[in-house]
Amino acid sequence: MKGSQLYRHLSLQGNRLHLHLFQGKKLQLHPSQGHKGTAHRTWKKGFATSAALPAGYDVRQVEITPLEQRKLTFDTHALVRELETHGFDKVQAETIVSALATLTNASIDTVYRDMVTRAQQEITVQQIMAHLDSIRKDMVILEKSEFATLRAENEKMKIELEHVRQHLLNETNRISADAKLDMNLERSRLTDLFTEQEKKLMEASTEFHKKNATTDSVITEINKKIDIDIASLKTLMESHKLDTVRYMAASVFTCLAIALGFYRLWK
């Protein structure tokens, strides 16, 4: 843009900056309102720079390369010439380029706050290696002492375990012997009980056979008596039968004689 309509607006959000360029070489630099933290400002060549530091983060001091020793990543003279060819006068072009250089330096400062130089890195690495060597030595010493302690504890535990094993072995043997003794006693008791029961069974069997023999003899005698009685009864019945036949025959002959007597008398 040319003349009185000269106006540039550079807007950067978050950690970045808002840059407003107006005609009359009036340059204002405002920190972002949406970022939390503390804004630090420096004034250089009529410009205000602002960078926000996040609150709650660790802040450490680092050696930042001085401004005069830094090299910009673009050609400022060529940029001034380019702006002049687009209608800016020399003062405006230099002002814009100076503002861009200031913004670049502010961004580099922000980046450098979280970085270290090679020398600092090497020193830090050497310090870390020294700490690691010290830790390694301490670990070796601790390892030896701990191993000695562990070895002693291990030996102590071995002895205690051996005592426990021997105690368990003795208890197992004692329990096994007691169990065997109880089993033998129970076996003897059962054998005696079985023998006694068998003896009682034999006595009962003998008594039963005796009673059976006695019963058989009694039954035989009874059968003999019954047979004798039956034979006697048969003999008696035969004798009674003969007497009855004789009586009947006599009765018949008597009746016939009476009948013949009456018959003769009737004639």
Curated annotation (Swiss-Prot):
The terms describing its cellular component in GO are: mitochondrial membrane
Topology relative to the membrane: Single-pass membrane protein
UniProt entry keywords in alphabetical sequence:
Coiled coil, Membrane, Mitochondrion, Transit peptide, Transmembrane, Transmembrane helix
Q: Which domain of life is it from?
A: Eukaryota
Targeting presequence: 1-47
Q: Which Pfam families match?
A: CCDC90-like (PF07798)
Q: Which residues cross the membrane?
A: 244-266
List where in the cell it is found. Mitochondrion membrane
Coiled coil where?
Answer: 142-175
Q: Which family does it belong to?
A: Belongs to the CCDC90 family.
Quote the protein name from its UniProt record.
Coiled-coil domain-containing protein 90B, mitochondrial
Organism of this sequence: Xenopus tropicalis
Lineage, uppermost ranks? Eukaryota, Metazoa, Chordata, Craniata, Vertebrata
Name of the gene encoding the protein in the UniProt record: ccdc90b
